[in-house]
Regions:
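C-terminal engagement modules used by replication, chromatin/transcription, nuclear envelope/ESCRT
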Residues: 1, 78-107
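Positively charged, polyanion-binding regions of nucleic-acid-associated proteins
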Residues: 1-49, 53-58, 70-77
Length: 107
């Protein structure tokens, strides 16, 4: 892992700023820039699976999904960003089910 909590906070803040600045006319360019979806009526929601991809490939920082998942709740709490744990329907009830997060960058 070459990403720490502060780097993740910086990335989430950058994505928040990009989201706030985006309009329906510019969101496609924003999504291309970060190679991830910004969803919701205000383009303020992202998913940790895509965030993981963007961190590794756009920001050129290496982190595993497990490492990202361990940092996300703390980073989101510090930034007052909403987050919800997600588990695939076919994994519900399984021990050690893979998780991901839906992150609301701003409200």
């Amino acid at each position: 892992m070459n990403i720490d909590l502060q780097k993740l906070i910086d990335i989430l803040n950058e994505l928040k700023t990009a989201s706030i600045s985006s309009t329906s006319d510019t969101i496609e360019a924003t999504m291309k820039k970060y190679d991830m979806l910004f969803v919701g009526s205000e383009f303020n929601t992202i998913y940790s699976v895509e965030l993981h991809h963007s961190i590794n490939n756009i920001f050129n920082l290496k982190i595993t999904m497990d490492e990202l998942n361990s940092l996300l709740p703390t980073a989101c709490n510090i930034l007052n960003m909403g987050f919800e744990k997600m588990i695939a329907v076919n994994d519900i009830g399984k021990p050690n089910a893979a998780i991901s997060y839906q992150i609301t960058l701003w409200k």
